[in-house]
Amino acid sequence: MSETLLDVKGMNCPLPVLRANKALRALKPGERLRVLATDRAAVGDFKAFCQETGHALVAASEEAGVFSFVIRKRETPQ
């Protein structure tokens, strides 16, 4: 499965979500975006973003202060 990497480490809210939204617009339905972020607020922000937009948050983890989120683009336009 295709996965695009978006590194937004060092950026604070709302920039990680805004950059992810822009990157998702360039993807085809079903493709995945992996976002790397260091802003602790990103955990709640990406969960809310996916619920609001219909994209699927398929994975979320944290290692050494870096949060990783895998988002699958929704299949149909909202």
Residues covered by each model-derived region:
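Right-handed parallel beta-helix/beta-solenoid
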Residues: 1-7
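Amphipathic, hydrophobic secondary-structure cores in small proteins
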Residues: 8-60
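Core SAM-dependent methyltransferase catalytic element
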Residues: 68-78
